[in-house]
Amino acid sequence: MKNARKIKDLLYEQVARIGKVFSSPKRLELIELLCQGEKRVETLASEASISVKLTSSHLRELRMAQLVETERQGKNIYYRLADKSVANLWVQIHMLAEERLVELQLALQKFVTQPDDLIPSDRDSLLKAARKGEVVVLDVRPADEYLNAHLPFARSIPLDELRQRLAELPKDRSIVAYCRGPYCLMAVDAVALLKQEGFTAIHLRDGIAEWEAAVSG
């Protein structure tokens, strides 16, 4: 075929656009945040701890790569993932990184992972126990993220409301807390608080993106 090299280079160049977008730590965090549901630029900037200007720049890159979409609602513009495949790719990338990178494994063990964390193979048993009411699955993300999507049988108590709402939780059953995913610390903080107050609490590293990827996979 004539110009075969030029054609091959063009094809790889286009695929590399996706890799380039995923090469930024902050864009990865924005993708994880958008896995929770659509959000305004200002909300994303606050949750990612960066300026609105820089957030807009990152979102522009994501949009150019067709990974996010926008919708105007009144005066506000909301961003969302283009489809579930973007969330699934994020899950596959961070799972590969956790498998291959010792530095990431050590960081997770030091800052995030707890000795009694539930592991992926526990999903079926967790679902059965939650269905029977033997455990309480607790979503500690903001309420709007819970309303967008949540794990089966989960109840919502955002982390910033947890201390005031402890009376709503039983002490005779284990509480399994989760948040946005394996790099989210809200569930870690929730488990620490619950244990301090005499509850039996366990950290589930999965977020909604990891759970849905496992179910669909």
Question: How should these model regions be labeled?
Answer:
Residues 63-73:
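Beta-hairpin "wing" of winged helix-turn-helix
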Residues 67, 169-212:
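Catalytic cysteine-centered active loop of the rhodanese-like fold, especially the PTP/DSP P-loop
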Residues 13-51, 77-82:
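N-terminal helix-turn-helix DNA-binding core of bacterial DNA-binding proteins
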Residues 125-189:
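Positively charged, proline/Ser/Thr-rich regional signature most characteristic
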Residues 59-60:
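Short, hydrophobic-biased segments on the C-terminal half of alpha helices
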Residues 1-11:
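Long, low-complexity, charged/polar intrinsically disordered regions in eukaryotic proteins
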Residues 50, 80-136, 140-148:
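Flexible, polar/low-complexity N-terminal or interdomain linker segments that lie immediately upstream
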